[in-house]
Amino acid sequence: MSERVILAYSGGLDTSVAISWIGKETGSEVVAVAIDLGQGGEDMEVVRQRALDCGAVEAVVVDARDEFAEQYCLPAIKSNALYMDRYPLVSALSRPLIVKHLVDAAREHGGGVVAHGCTGKGNDQVRFEVGFASLAPDLKVLAPVRDYAWTREKAIAFAEENAIPINVTKRSPFSIDQNVWGRAVETGFLEHLWNAPTKDVYDYTEDPTLNWSSPDEVIIGFDKGVPVSIDGKPVTVLQAIEQLNARAGAQGVGRLDVVEDRLVGIKSREIYEAPGAMVLITAHTELEHVTLERELGRFKRTTDQKWGELVYDGLWFSPLKTALESFVANTQEHVTGEIRLVLHGGHIAVNGRRSQESLYDFNLATYDEGDTFDQSAAKGFVHVHGLSSSLSARRDLAGK
């Protein structure tokens, strides 16, 4: 029996060409694995059949939408994950899930090699291969696009020469990756930083001015950090993301034009659309402001940033990320309540908060009659709080 290669299959040009190329160049059989992450577009059965038509001996489609939402997007919500304070890890979150299912497929179908279609410039090669090394160090890795310097032109030529059944065009200007958490667009004229995105860049979001006269007010309920309701109606995490993608997307919310620091050392420009993700992270962050004690909240903001950096850098399976998630789980014990937001003109505005776990005390906060704050204690507090600063200032002045 020939050696089997388990290929992460997207249904696009590069991975369709890879099926035929691997067979011709290595003599191996290819098992194509396509993961449904809520990316929409083509029917997954069409994708599966294409893999078979391209020469795969088997083609597997995994419906991982709920798994992706519950086990990958939800931790990102709880960690308010925004790489460089902006990017909600649209692609980065999906890669470890794909790795997991490729490893499972390798065990089930007798594969000794796993393959991906990443280039040598991007972050995804790291995310895939560090993931494989973490979960299945015995598996060999094949990366034909990177290791054999494929270009789009070369891939198209190979497809035409070998009658690979896929429709391609040399004029498609963008590289696109999408799932239910969001959509990433790069390359083409966007590589020139001064060029503004054109309308055809966007798909998940409408023009922010389109529904200008119809703002959308939404109430999101959380239970211990988990989104559980929208406008009082129970939802799963996947349903919350999908519903907010539609509602926030209609208001032009979630458009991000970012120059980010890639793991490989270069800067790249990316256009992201993540309407549901940005609304959920905004709401969750606001509820934490209401329910977390000050020092806990301050420290968690540092761990949120680190968690996002670890995921971006392909270290999903690292001990540090695992440890941080244990900490985050503890912080979510009281993150229960509702946040009201207005979605309008591409913006998210919080205008209401309520929680039985709130640390906001009206009687302490009010400046009106009924104030219970003991202002007589403030003078001594200010003196003690500033004592170290006043002592050092006194010393410095005496030395002049």
UniProtKB/Swiss-Prot annotation:
UniProt keyword annotation of Nucleotide-binding present: yes
Classification via InterPro entries: Arginosuc_syn_C, Arginosuc_syn_N, Arginosuc_synth, Arginosuc_synth_CS, Arginosuc_synth_type_1_subfam, AS_cat/multimer_dom_body, Rossmann-like_a/b/a_fold
Protein name: Argininosuccinate synthase
EC number: 6.3.4.5
Subcellular locations according to the entry: Cytoplasm
Gene: argG
Similarity remark: Belongs to the argininosuccinate synthase family. Type 1 subfamily.
Catalysed reactions listed for this entry: L-citrulline + L-aspartate + ATP = 2-(N(omega)-L-arginino)succinate + AMP + diphosphate + H(+)
Keyword hit for NAD: no
Keywords linked to the UniProt accession: Amino-acid biosynthesis, Arginine biosynthesis, ATP-binding, Cytoplasm, Ligase, Nucleotide-binding
Residue positions binding L-citrulline: Y87, N123, R127, S175, E260, Y272
Binding site for ATP: A8, Y9, S10, G11, G12, L13, D14, T15, S16, G117
Signal sequence bounds: none
Oligomeric and partner information: Homotetramer.
GO molecular function terms listed in the Swiss-Prot or TrEMBL record: argininosuccinate synthase activity; ATP binding
Chain residues that bind L-aspartate: T119, N123, D124
Any one GO CC term of the record: cytoplasm
Pfam families in the record: Arginosuc_syn_C (PF20979), Arginosuc_synth (PF00764)
Pathway(s) where this gene product acts: Amino-acid biosynthesis; L-arginine biosynthesis; L-arginine from L-ornithine and carbamoyl phosphate: step 2/3
A Gene Ontology BP annotation from the UniProt entry: argininosuccinate metabolic process
Enzyme class (EC, first level): ligase
